Regions:
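Conserved N-terminal alpha-helix of the aminotransferase class I/II PLP-enzyme fold
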Residues: 90-123
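PLP-dependent class I/II
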Residues: 7-10, 18-20, 24-31, 35, ...
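Basic nucleic-acid-binding alpha-helical/helix-turn surface characteristic of O6-alkylguanine DNA
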Residues: 86
Length: 426
């Protein structure tokens, strides 16, 4: 037997041995490396502990997730009741044209100059992010993201084989955009884009015109994509203007905007979003992924189209409610010894620093080992909004999406918890 044959015989026996061992010990094939490095949601990973707390009869105040309690507009339910179709057929892969036309008119109200041809309806804003990354990023490509950032950006980047390069903002600066030089330092031949969320989730920060201009100049200088998540545009509280990426002149073809009806119409379960771009090549590529998933939800599109006609007084009432909740929560947090949070300018979240050793442990402890008069609080550990594992250890994200009476109770319970938490630092 020559050397090559001996090598083949050895390798074949090795493989046979491996198969026999797997069968003997009932070892299943391994999951993908992509799946193994996919981060858990900091928003949802504590749900099992929350469920167990509720089973014990504990009232859980949910400040962990952006699920508004404001009733969905009546026009949405009216549209649902009026559906009289005989067949719930596929819609076009890019969405119903009448919905895209109405979305374009809606965007015009915000000085966003697009047509229905620039709009692709997606199954939630998350699919818009996912399809954009799959269409624009190759494995090993890099995107620069200000952090803390919505955790699903990293998850979808991993799915595309891309790498998130973070630029860290700080609570001391109110989570303002870091110096643009920090972005430029990270640019390499593999850098394909910058991603922003404006107004920001999780911090509530609202980017200024000056900050947006600096991003524009960098995008133009290096010919990058500008991915812009703008689902919270309705929620800007300080009088400062909302600046869309589409307001930035000279980079119109670089901009890919993400949108959703989930937050502005309180329709998180509808799963209707949009990807908006003037870049025809990107749209054509995105459409391939849209065709592979066939169509966005038909019923959801019908309801979303009707929701665009939500009365202005509904929107104003909702806006005023969030203004009050924001002030109530921020004032209440900053009155608790050792707690600090800046004033968020938009969205309905804030990131707070707590006098604790580890936010992940604290948030789990609240649900598994603590209750005050049958109540506890659920929050999102901020570590999950950073790429680096050592950041956000003493920070949490809170969503002011419950009524003020419950916010007051949640704040009181949080104060009591911090007084007895074994890992408190003051």
């Amino acid at each position: 037997m020559n050397r090559s044959n001996r090598t083949f015989f050895y390798l074949k026996n090795q493989e046979d041995c491996k198969i026999r061992v797997q069968k003997y010990f009932n070892i299943m094939p391994q999951t993908s490396n992509r799946g193994k490095i996919m981060p858990e949601s900091p928003i949802r990973k504590l749900v099992p502990l929350s469920d167990k707390a509720k089973e014990r009869g504990v009232k859980v105040y949910h400040l962990n997730i952006g699920q508004p309690d404001v009733p969905t507009p009546a026009v949405a339910f009216d549209a649902l009741k009026k559906i009289d179709r005989k067949v719930l057929e596929y819609s076009p892969s890019d969405g119903i044209k009448s919905l895209r036309v109405k979305l374009a008119k809606y965007y015009h109200e915000f000085n966003i100059d697009v047509t229905e041809k620039d709009i692709i309806v997606t199954t939630g804003g998350s699919e818009a992010v996912n399809f954009a990354f799959m269409s624009c990023l190759d494995p090993g490509d890099e995107i620069i993201v200000p952090e803390p950032a919505y955790a699903n950006y990293t998850a979808f980047a991993i799915g595309a084989g891309a790498i998130v390069k973070p630029v860290v903002s700080t609570i001391e600066d109110g989570f303002a955009l870091p110096p643009i030089e920090k972005f430029e330092e990270l640019i390499t031949p593999r850098t394909k884009g910058i991603l922003i969320c404006n107004p920001n989730n999780p911090t509530g920060y609202l980017y200024t015109q000056t900050e947006m201009n600096k991003i524009r100049d960098l995008v133009k200088k290096y010919d990058l994509y500008l991915f812009s998540d703008e689902v919270y545009r309705e929620f800007c509280y300080t009088g400062a203007p909302y600046i869309s990426a589409f307001h930035l002149k000279g980079i119109e073809d670089n901009v890919i905007l993400f949108d959703s009806v989930s937050k502005r119409y309180n329709e998180c379960g509808l799963r209707i979003g949009a990807l908006v771009t003037k870049n025809e090549a990107v749209r054509k590529c995105v459409m391939k992924f849209c065709q592979a998933r066939l169509s966005p939800p038909l019923i959801g599109q019908i309801i979303a189209e009707a929701s665009i006609d939500t009365p202005k007084d509904y929107m104003l009432k909702m806006y005023n409610e969030y203004v009050e909740r924001r002030k109530f929560l921020i004032d209440g947090l900053n009155r608790i010894p050792g707690v600090y949070t800046p004033i968020p300018m938009g969205a309905f979240y804030t990131v707070a620093r707590l006098p604790i050793d580890d936010a992940d442990k604290f948030c789990a402890w609240l649900l598994s080992d603590f209750q005050y008069e049958g109540q506890t609080v659920m929050m999102a550990p901020a570590s999950g909004f950073y790429t680096a594992k050592d950041l956000g250890k003493d920070e949490v994200r809170l969503a002011y999406v419950i009524e003020k009476e419950d916010l007051a109770k949640a704040l009181f319970v949080l104060r009591k918890a911090l007084e007895v938490y074994p890992g408190r630092t003051i």
